Amino acid sequence: MGIRSYKAYTPGTRNRSVSQFEEIIQIKPEKKLTYGQHRQKGRNNRGIITSRHRGGGHKRLYRQIDFRRNKQGIIGEIQTIEYDPNRKARICLTQYSDGEKRYILQPRGIRIGDQILASPDAPIVAGNTLPLTNMPLGTIIHNVELQPGKGGQIARAAGTVAQIVAKEGLLATLRMPSGEFRLVSQKCLATVGQVGNVDANNESLGKAGSKRWLGKRPKVRGVVMNAADHPHGGGEGRAPIGRKRPLTPWGRPTLGRRSRPRHKYSEALILRRRKNA
């Protein structure tokens, strides 16, 4: 996938770079696998903001993605490679030999006409899905389950990849995309290979309007607010925050304070925390 950069025709195109979408084949999605969705826009059932900086954006149709990959022993053929507005990764329309069609995440290197298989005996080829116990050490994987049968939850974003680094007993040790080392049951399914669209992080929006198209609203710094609106606010002119440590708008410590619960059930499964933690 290539990245197209713009010349500085306007201030908005000076730093703008977008995907060329050269691998996109299908324009309209499969109608039976799409449905409308009401986006919450950061509001709860009473219409009160519970998550700031969300709202607006272009209307989207949700594509139903097969994260479980539970069509065991049935060969599927890649029919199309499509754009999905709900994620950075591309998606593939797969038609199985029994006639059913499903969307899957596009693994890197997959082309139209390639065949994929979900089976315990499937070969170690990009796009195939099998249990971790049947994969050799060092295999790079994506769409990894945390609980057997629940569906893939790890390494689903564009360009992400996890790796099997060890196996012992009923558990396998994975190196996560964040750098964290975590234990996962060897019964969990995973898909071989890396998620496609690896250059997604190299795109630059270039202007504020592009972020509004994505449904993201402006983030105002607390230091420029009034003292009544934020603990960092107030003062004469450009003033420091006036506190020992940064605080949230509601007075809680932030920017460095760990927010993960201390006694979470999965704490014993994490061998090494992520790199930037």
UniProtKB/Swiss-Prot annotation:
Gene3D superfamilies: 2.30.30.30, Nucleic acid-binding proteins, Ribosomal protein L2, domain 3. The keyword Oxidoreductase does not apply. GO terms for cellular component: chloroplast; mitochondrial large ribosomal subunit. Keywords: Chloroplast, Plastid, Ribonucleoprotein, Ribosomal protein. PROSITE patterns: RIBOSOMAL_L2 (PS00467). Transmembrane segments: none annotated. SMART domains: Ribosomal_L2 (SM01383), Ribosomal_L2_C (SM01382). GO terms for biological process: mitochondrial translation. It is found in: Plastid, Chloroplast. Residues 35-57, 226-262 are annotated as: Disordered. One of its GO terms (molecular function) is transferase activity. PANTHER family: LARGE RIBOSOMAL SUBUNIT PROTEIN UL2M, RIBOSOMAL PROTEIN L2. NCBIfam families: rplB_bact. Part of the 50S ribosomal subunit. Belongs to the universal ribosomal protein uL2 family. This is Large ribosomal subunit protein uL2c. It comes from Staurastrum punctulatum (Green alga).
